[in-house]
Regions:
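Extracellular loop-to-transmembrane helix junctions
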Residues: 1-19, 72-102, 111, 445-453
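Membrane-interface loop-to-helix entry segments
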Residues: 5, 9-27, 119, 129, ...
Length: 470
């Protein structure tokens, strides 16, 4: 219990101190934001700050900090450390920078921002990378809820898929204040209530369960290595490239740059809290990582979430679990397709104020998502996890270049360059040894990951610090 409370306190302190430091470095101004200057009534619309925060939280969270945290809990309480320090020094910085830079670039999608600061080659890579990731996210958060609804109702999963797709169509096409701004705050509140309800149940010892204290021991039932597998598995609970595709959506709705820290950094810290709660629930509810692994293998993560909610919160928990497990991923999926539409629109220069022009992009994207939904969920999730963290790495390097150019003469770029280097090691090491990667031995993948990260760092220094000195 004390380990959990200590980690929870660190997240709060991280927001208050490190989040403030990052915000101070960026020097927010009172210049009119894109929401105020453009205000097209579709994507650029000034919204109340509390509503922007709740939409941002639900956009980036969904089931990410739940599924990822439960998966990370298989390694034991050591996952707490990655959630806490990853959130403060990588995830919070990543989300704040992607939102703030987009805010200062007229709400441009992240691929356009990357292209401006890393060059035309990276622009094309990021456009493709972003659209692929967003469609994967939309597909992942389409099939999970559809399958669970089929289990609960006895209806054909395909029918539920079509219903979810129909909702995606409306949410992707309609102005952001028609569906998303009206219902997301409610679902976001349910997500928070579910998480805090479980936290209080954990602290109260409901069901006679005892929270294990922090240990660095690898408790994975199959003895899989913590490095780099746990760092990829936790994903959204610590740092997530998907968030950078969502932040521009809310950058187009913020009334002031001074609101960026509570909205972007704050939402990431809130997600870190949710992930910490679910990681603690995972290592506590099933009494051992072996029990958690057996539950996840037997009934899957959707049902495991349901069991934990009901076990800790009773009937109320089951209702919230239904809202969380079904509504939250759907709300992540619809904004994923919306972001994909906007990314493609920026790519080809297609104005999106006209409904017909929005249809040109929305229909084929949803069609691809529908086709991908027929592929095994586990396969899609594995590729999503690596793609997600790789995008985070690229965005952090973009932030480092932006900060070097914007704040010349200071070392402010280190705020982004250090986590960018770390994530470079994580992502390259993982893909070199993973089943869906090159399947190299750890004796090769471990040193190779550090070598690749060193190369990325050298390239960054070459086009910034070393170029200036020469």
């Amino acid at each position: 219990m004390y380990s959990f409370l200590g980690c929870l306190a660190l997240l709060v302190v991280g927001f208050l101190i490190y989040g403030k430091l990052v915000d101070t470095v960026f020097k927010p101004t009172d210049e009119p934001t894109p929401a105020v200057r453009i205000n097209d009534g579709v994507d650029y619309i000034p919204l109340p700050t509390w509503k922007v925060f709740m939409i941002q939280l639900l956009n980036i969270a969904g089931l990410g900090p739940i599924f990822g945290a439960l998966g990370g809990a298989l390694w034991g309480p050591s996952v707490y450390l990655w959630i806490v320090f990853g959130t403060i020094f990588a995830g919070g910085v990543h989300d704040y920078m992607s939102g703030m830079i987009s805010l200062r670039e007229n709400g441009k999608s992240i691929s356009e921002v990357v292209g401006k600061y890393l060059g035309s080659l990276m622009l094309h890579i990021m456009r493709l990378f972003s659209v692929v990731l967003l469609v994967l996210v939309g597909t992942v958060f389409m099939t999970g809820p559809a399958n669970l609804l089929a289990m609960l109702t006895g209806m054909d999963p395909t029918m539920w898929l079509l219903i979810v797709l129909a909702y995606y169509f409306l949410a992707t096409l309609l102005p952001i204040d028609t569906l998303i701004a009206r219902f997301y705050p409610l679902f976001g509140a349910c997500l928070l209530i579910m998480a805090f309800g479980i936290m209080f149940a954990l602290l109260a010892g409901v069901g006679g369960h005892t929270m294990p204290e922090l240990t660095l021991q690898n408790l994975h039932p199959k003895d899989l290595p913590i490095w780099p597998l746990m760092f990829i598995t936790v994903a959204c609970g610590a740092v997530s490239g998907f968030h950078s595709t969502q932040s521009p959506l809310m950058a187009r709705c913020l009334k002031s740059e001074r609101l960026a820290r509570p909205v972007f950094y704050g939402a990431m810290v809130a997600e870190g809290v949710i992930a910490l709660v679910w990681a603690a629930a995972g290592v506590t509810f099933y009494d051992s990582t072996g029990g958690l692994a057996a539950a996840m293998a037997d009934v899957g993560q959707n049902k495991a979430v349901y069991e934990i909610c009901v076990g800790f919160m009773g009937y109320v928990g089951s209702v919230l679990a239904m809202l969380g497990v079904i509504a939250c991923p759907i709300t992540s999926g619809d904004t994923a397709f919306r972001s994909a539409r906007l990314t493609l629109a920026d790519w080809i220069g297609l104005e999106q104020g006209n409904k017909v022009k929005r249809l040109y992009l929305a229909l084929p994207l949803l069609a691809v998502g529908g086709l991908l939904s027929q592929i095994n969920f586990t396969i899609i999730w594995r590729y999503f996890a690596w793609t997600n963290q790789t995008l985070a790495m690229i965005v952090l390097w973009t932030g480092a270049v932006y900060m070097y150019r914007k704040f010349k003469g200071s070392k402010a770029y280190l705020i982004a360059a250090i986590p960018a280097t770390f994530m470079s090691v994580v992502t390259t090491t993982y893909i070199l040894q993973a089943k869906e990667g090159l399947q190299l031995s750890t004796s090769i993948s471990y040193p190779a990951g550090f070598v690749f990260a060193a190369i990325f760092l050298f390239l960054f220094l070459r086009v910034t610090v070393l170029k200036k000195e020469s």
